[in-house]
């Protein structure tokens, strides 16, 4: 299976390439990507290359596909996942897989899985950690691509629980931190 993708080879070394990903394995899923949002952390990753904490050390020999805020359609399902995932279904991914002892993440660590591609092979760890997430058939792909950054915003608001509001009627009162 061929794909066209933006791959990272090193510091400030991004290349748009068409390449073969090989045959789909029984524990993988093939997705056609429709959208990928651009994130500042992808920019940071492209500048730092292998110095980035989530990027593999050997990207000059095994480049990774950048991008992690993506959504697409399942086009082929490996035998292991046929009971859980169906061809033609719309999905997005949670990029931070949270593997104990590892910083691996979609768009930073995988040779055939990242958002800036036409097709990707989703590695088994994504399904094992329930990080391949379906979304409503009536929702736009861009909405699913924005799920991860939106969760960051919501998380930031929730983390502000320790702050109280400054009351307009009491102009001398300071916010409690």
What are these regions (language model features)?
Residues 44-52:
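Short Gly/aromatic-enriched secondary-structure transition segments
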Residues 7-13:
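Extracellular beta-rich ligand/substrate-recognition surface
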Residues 166-177:
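Single conserved hydrophobic/aromatic residue that forms the stacking wall/gate
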Residues 22-36, 51-100, 114, 136:
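Glycine-rich beta-strand-centered segment in the early N-terminal region that forms part
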């Amino acid at each position: 299976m061929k794909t066209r993708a933006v791959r990272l080879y090193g510091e400030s070394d991004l290349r748009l390439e068409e390449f073969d990903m090989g045959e789909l394995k029984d524990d993988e899923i093939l997705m056609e990507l429709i959208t990928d949002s651009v994130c500042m952390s992808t920019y940071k990753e492209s500048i730092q290359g292998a110095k980035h904490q989530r990027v593999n050390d050997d990207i000059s020999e095994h480049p990774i596909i950048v991008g992690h805020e993506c959504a697409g359609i399942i086009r082929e399902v490996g035998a292991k996942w046929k009971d859980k995932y169906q061809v033609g279904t719309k999905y997005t991914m949670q990029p931070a897989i949270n593997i104990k002892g590892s910083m691996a993440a979609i768009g930073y660590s995988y040779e055939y899985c990242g958002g800036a591609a036409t097709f990707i092979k989703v590695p088994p760890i994504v399904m094992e950690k329930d990080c391949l997430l379906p979304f409503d058939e009536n929702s736009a792909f861009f909405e699913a691509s924005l799920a991860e950054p939106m969760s960051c915003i919501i998380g930031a608001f929730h983390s502000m629980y320790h702050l109280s509001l400054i009351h307009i009627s009491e102009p001398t009162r300071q916010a409690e931190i």
